[in-house]
Amino acid sequence: GTAFSGLSGTYFFCQARFGSDSHTTQWNFGQRPFAYTAPSGFKALCTQNLPTPTIGATSATRANKYFDVVLRTSNGNVGGTYSTTVNMSNGALLWDKGRSINSSHYLLDSVRGISKTLSSDTTGAEANYPNWFTNFGSSSFTTGSDDYTAGTTVVDWIWAANGSGSTNNAGSIQSTVSASTLSGFSIVTYTGNATAGATVGHGLGVTPSMFIIKSRSLATGWPVYHVNSNASPATGYLSLQVSFHSF
């Protein structure tokens, strides 16, 4: 018979037993014949009956084509070239952090130009380091003479975008956007107009669940919007540069 009806939301399967004795549980999601006939209109919960995923459906859309983590050791002012699974020549954002030293977090991208950095742990305005990251390639990135001291271990998080940026007029403020609609990630730059209710196009084609904002020209914070941050996410934002929430 029907155990439940009218349920909504996300489902998680679990099994629990009370007591100190041990039990073995076997789950049958369709890998074996069912003991009873499934109700009309229902299918086994298995990969074959799930929708084809947008990410990972083919070798060209594997998740590591859109996001990668690179662990590297700096060669100092000699610079170096480091491999990645992301085609950074087609637009990317790189988030850099020294692991073996106390350093800031540095963000750079293809839209602003890879010599321009912002630090997520400070309120500082954009800085320019023309000899730090010198190239975003199709399967690697290159550092120059402004890289960390030789021997420093570093982590770089990399997100794929889509090009060096194109004009977007979807909002009341014109923006420059590099958007990967398949992976749901975009880089957006714009010039604010100090007008309440102004809108900015992001190029994704769907409502984003999260975004991070930082002024490039002013020493300001890093407000972070997330759809599930609290009951009023538009005003209940987080700030990257501090260790407490800003609800």
What do these predicted ranges mean?
Residues 2-247:
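Surface-exposed molecular-recognition determinants
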